């Protein structure tokens, strides 16, 4: 069996409220465990609308049919009214995910804020964002948070340095090919990174593949992956608008010798065996703006 890390990003209030119960039921049915990363603070995702002025983001929204894919309430959240606090109202679903045997970590306090402002926040502001997120998630889970994955893969060496204070077992902050130990700004070795290696639905539909062909496309990408495959889904997509399509994918992979697992299951017993690398800012196909990407050293 080819082991593939399955990462579930939970970005929004509605994605938590509606997408989590759907995915928990589907994963239980197919006997799958995954790593869930929750946004826990205010849902301000509608404030991304200003990015429509950027041609690359506008094209991404058009080709993925974003209004249908996400729903208008998600696209407008936190614009004309204050964003709802996700963990405050829906923390029980985060605990339910943990109790179902899945790995649970922090995605963000304010997902939209992190994507839009991380590059200009001070070190103190970055620290506060992570701290608020950790505290809210720990309150919901009633146990320490041991892993994290920053919103939108917006991470660089400065972000990694800030996150060292929280002593996570691993982070999944970047795109790349295989787990590694990041070299930090001060020359020290940071917390293990488990990069996402495979494209997400919204990165390739409308450019590389048609919607109806996506499942076979991602299976082919998994088979071609020569590193340590990690696949990201979103509750707002695979847990809602594309739930039926995603369940078809799970049925297909059962016949392809592919097994999904939590990200921590991809790590060796001795993490000192992992190679070193860096996380650097880079453009990425299908995404607007910079992402954190793995670089060999």
Swiss-Prot record:
CDD domains listed in its UniProt record: CE4_ArnD
Domain of life of the source: Bacteria
Pathway annotation from the record: Glycolipid biosynthesis; 4-amino-4-deoxy-alpha-L-arabinose undecaprenyl phosphate biosynthesis; 4-amino-4-deoxy-alpha-L-arabinose undecaprenyl phosphate from UDP-4-deoxy-4-formamido-beta-L-arabinose and undecaprenyl phosphate: step 2/2; Bacterial outer membrane biogenesis; lipopolysaccharide biosynthesis
Catalytic function, reaction form: 4-deoxy-4-formamido-alpha-L-arabinopyranosyl di-trans,octa-cis-undecaprenyl phosphate + H2O = 4-amino-4-deoxy-alpha-L-arabinopyranosyl di-trans,octa-cis-undecaprenyl phosphate + formate
UniProt keywords, alphabetically: Antibiotic resistance, Hydrolase, Lipid A biosynthesis, Lipid biosynthesis, Lipid metabolism, Lipopolysaccharide biosynthesis
Enzyme Commission code(s) on record: 3.5.1.n3
Span of domain NodB homology: 2-261
Pfam families (alphabetical): Polysacc_deac_1
Keyword Iron: no
One GO MF term attached to the UniProt entry: hydrolase activity, acting on carbon-nitrogen (but not peptide) bonds, in linear amides
HAMAP family per record: ArnD
Protein name in the entry: Probable 4-deoxy-4-formamido-L-arabinose-phosphoundecaprenol deformylase ArnD
